[in-house]
Amino acid sequence: MAWQIAPLIVPERRILISLYLFMAGIILFHLMPDIWHSGRYLNWLVTVFLLTSILGLGVAIYTRQSAGHDRGLFLFVVFTAGIALASLQFALHDQPKIKWGVTADINGMLIKIDGNADARSRLWISLGATSDIVKNDILPAGGIVRVTTDKWQDQQYIGGAIAMRVRLYPPPDRILHGMPDYGRRARVNDVLASGYVISEITMMPDDHAESIMHDVKLFLARYRAGFAAHLVDLMPKPAGAIAAALLVGERRFISEDVYNRFRDSGLAHLLAISGLHMGLICFGSMAVIRFFGALFPSRSSRFALHKYAAIIAAIIGGCYVLMSGAPVSALRAFGMAMLVVLAILHDRMALTLRNVCLAAFAILAFNPVALFTASFQLSFAATAILVIWYESRARRGPAKWHWSLRYPMALITMSFLSAMATAPFAAQHFGTVTPWGLVANIIGIPLTGLWIMPVGMVLTISTLFGLDWVVAPLMTAGLDGLYYLADWIAGFPLAGWKVAPPGYSALVVMVTGVMISQLLIKPMARIGLGLVVIGGGIWAVRPVPDGVLFAVGRTPQLVLAGTNSMALSYAPLSEFLASMGELRMGQSIEQADLAKCMPACKHDFSKGISANIVMKAKGLTAACKDLETAFILTNVTPRYPCYSGKPIYNISQKTGYNYLIFIDKNKFKLINNFGSARQVCPALQPRPC
């Protein structure tokens, strides 16, 4: 069978099979029941799959003379390695967590601050040994807790010891079915609890001794925070905040309104350090070195100047990653840059899909859970599609456009391809699609690449000599232009268009299709394109919830989808829960006029049906008599059925889970946040539903 399939595969693309199986192993581990994610079962899993991977690799090497067996065994090893590394990551972060809310006095070292400029700050604190919850053996010393506060905005105390009284809760489970599991991400970051501050924050003497590596990390964090604060003070709003995001990856100074404008215009990717920024910093430096070398041809021709320039560019790129705090997007970009540098040093083709796969392998090997993050998916989707386009363009030869049109046409093509490749992932993680992103990026990318980032490099260097005030006005002008562009595009119709997420099944089918289209020879590659279309069809026909019910640890809070792409909340929602509801339903959420719903009110669904929402018991009688509605949703327990036979669904008892609500005529279906589905029977119904 292997010999029959082998001629259909493009030889240099075989690495796609390995990457696909490696990711499949990671996904399989995360699909396992929770019992396999902690304790002795997790230890067994790690042991079995690590040994299996090692033994399989040994056998594959021993039998390498038999090509078919060797390749099959190697693919098996890659698959088991995905499971082994994913389970090992969880085993290394298998620490005790609180099981319920606790109030305690804590102290520890402040290691990070994030949030938005106009919202509450979030403090990341490494617990000290004298904290109440540590002395009572609730949480271990060194564990991280995240707490929010509106009384702390100064970042200069990163690394300092602080004390406060807090209310802590366990890391959240999956909020809604089909949504990211933030609890697992918190786990791999050693975050054991989250909550909020309920007292004043006080500074404490810092008398602890740490390792050299810890001191280096602390120095970089303090530098990043201090430089970001300096940029904010140096430039007017919002230019200083945008500069901090571009140069050192500190986005907490950006207000929510400014970020929303960038997101709706399709320019939010410019605020996260990624391949664009790394390419400008790294290879821009290499170009400058080669330019000055070209001024002295007699000397520069005596040695391989381009290779020395590549090495210097790699060092500069590494410094940029450290300055930015090494987020996934920056690590991916730096990994790609290093592969390009290695290709230059070995006189090989640099931009290849193989190098993209190697960078993905490297990141996922060290952080398997990154596979499920928006940063990883968006950055690799954009990078892969651009490299695929570049390789196909290189095979076709130079473009036939006039030289003055080549750069604009290439920019338009790259922007279009990037927008198409990232749209499903943006919809999955953010619930929005930006039709005008192509227009915004045609202007925004050259503005960032040719003006803002080069001036930013000069500004960073000039800060060392106290001359940043000379360069700041020039960078401010470029940043203002970028902000005005985002503001202008965000005002267009359908900018930031709310859509329902495609779901992981559709994403898997589409990714599989893209890989097959690049793996197989041309006639068979159409199978992959067909799978991409099928994945889009799965997205199109995926049922969209008619509402959500948040009931974990709280009184049930009902949100129902409405007409004109606007959902209504029949209880006050936190900003976080509102964003989760909007993402899952693909609609904006507004607070209903609760005064009109006392004791009852009418809700219209986009399906053409209506329901009565009953908030008080005395509203049941009027709701039963309303002939224009199909059923009743009540937050109070009914004592009698409707004489008309209208179904009454009691949501007051639906506690302990968050639910997706699906309504089909008079049928009422709930899916909890763990994926368990059931049809709900009307209250007081005399016969089974």
Locate the predicted segments by residue:
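Membrane-interface amphipathic/re-entrant loop segments adjacent to transmembrane helices
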Residues: 203-219, 225, 260, 264, ...
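Membrane-helix interface and helix-disruption motif detector
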Residues: 33-45, 66-68, 439, 496-500
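Non-globular, low-confidence helical/coil segments that flank catalytic cores
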Residues: 37-38, 133, 151-167, 178, ...
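Membrane-interface helix/helix-cap signal primarily in integral membrane proteins
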Residues: 2-9, 63-269, 637-642, 649-688
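Hydrophobic alpha-helical transmembrane segments in multi-pass membrane proteins
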Residues: 8, 17, 25, 70-72, ...
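Divalent metal-coordination and catalytic microenvironments
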Residues: 25, 108, 166, 246, ...
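Hydrophobic alpha-helical segments
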Residues: 1-37, 343-344, 458-469, 476, ...
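Hydrophobic core of alpha-helical transmembrane segments in multi-pass integral membrane proteins
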Residues: 44-61, 80-85, 507-518, 531-538
